[in-house]
């Protein structure tokens, strides 16, 4: 039979200590107290601006077979280099080296998504113009 939690008139300290220890099993609590949010490339922000340093193709994981179009971005705020996915068919053509891009997170909190290994971010804007607007032909790149 399980022991369970202590009961009794003088069990308060033991209960408080146990609760304090058990909080560390919660991932959100862990991240909050250890300050992991500030150690990621965005430093707690939802978006970040950066410069495109090169275009890269990243091979997708098994069982898929494709080359996912990505760019290497040098973030302006902290000079970290990241890989960012370029969504939609043909949008890589709107990007050139040294273009300023706005990058956002991609999918699950701090994890790569789908079959693209090691890519945690996506390109949202190029030179202040939405990538979606460029793709649909509503705006032109300056």
From Swiss-Prot:
Q: Does the keyword Ribonucleoprotein apply?
A: yes
The residue ranges crossing the membrane are none
Pfam (any one): Ribosom_S12_S23
Which BP terms from GO are recorded?
translation
Gene Ontology CC annotation, any one: small ribosomal subunit
Molecular function as annotated in GO: structural constituent of ribosome
Q: Which UniProt keywords apply?
A: Ribonucleoprotein, Ribosomal protein
Superkingdom of the source species: Eukaryota
By its UniProt entry, which SUPFAM superfamilies does this protein fall under? Nucleic acid-binding proteins
The similarity comment for this entry is: Belongs to the universal ribosomal protein uS12 family.
* Protein name, entry field: Small ribosomal subunit protein uS12
Phylogenetic placement of the source organism: Eukaryota, Sar, Alveolata, Ciliophora, Intramacronucleata
């Amino acid at each position: 039979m399980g022991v369970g939690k202590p009961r009794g008139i003088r069990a308060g300290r033991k209960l408080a200590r146990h609760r304090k220890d058990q909080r560390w099993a919660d991932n959100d609590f862990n991240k909050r107290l250890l300050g992991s949010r500030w150690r990621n490339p965005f430093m707690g922000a939802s978006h970040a601006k950066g410069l495109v340093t090169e275009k890269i193709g990243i091979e997708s994981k098994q069982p898929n077979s494709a080359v996912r179009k990505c760019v290497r971005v040098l973030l302006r705020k902290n000079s970290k280099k990241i890989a960012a996915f370029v969504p939609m068919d043909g949008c890589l053509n709107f990007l050139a080296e040294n273009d300023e891009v706005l990058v956002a997170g991609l999918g699950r909190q701090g994890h790569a998504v789908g079959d693209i290994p090691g890519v945690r971010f996506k390109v949202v804007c190029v030179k202040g113009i939405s990538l979606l607007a460029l793709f649909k032909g509503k705006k032109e790149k300056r």
